[in-house]
């Protein structure tokens, strides 16, 4: 099955404390979760690793959110959109369902 949302897609968050925020998908995880740039920022406490020259302390980073809580962002309509698949010239392509434009 082809993925409706892929890495580097611009998405919008549908639920949670970050609802309405937009960002690029930086990583797709195998358990149905994604990491979106600038969304769900958490603070991790990291230990120093002198052998690698890493200083410890508080580090802010993005946490994974479920793929069902995001939707692809359509720049033409400035809204969240659904994704469909169709074949064009023998290749399977994704398109926005609202305006049939290829992604």
UniProtKB/Swiss-Prot annotation:
UniProt superkingdom: Bacteria
SMART domains per UniProt: KOW (SM00739)
A Pfam family it matches: KOW
Amino-acid biosynthesis in keyword set: no
Record's keyword annotation contains rRNA-binding: yes
Record NCBIfam families: rplX_bact
Name recorded for this polypeptide: Large ribosomal subunit protein uL24
UniProt source species: Actinobacillus pleuropneumoniae serotype 3 (strain JL03)
Gene giving rise to this polypeptide: rplX
């Amino acid at each position: 099955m082809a993925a409706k949302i892929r890495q580097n897609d611009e998405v919008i968050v549908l639920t949670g404390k970050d609802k309405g925020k937009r960002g690029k998908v930086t990583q797709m995880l195998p358990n149905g979760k994604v990491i979106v740039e600038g969304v769900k920022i958490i603070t991790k406490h990291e230990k120093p690793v002198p052998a690698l020259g890493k200083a410890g302390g508080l580090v802010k980073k993005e946490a994974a959110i479920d793929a069902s809580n995001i939707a692809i962002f359509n720049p033409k309509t400035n809204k969240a959109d659904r994704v469909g698949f169709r074949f064009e010239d023998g290749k399977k392509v994704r398109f926005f369902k609202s305006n049939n434009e290829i992604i």
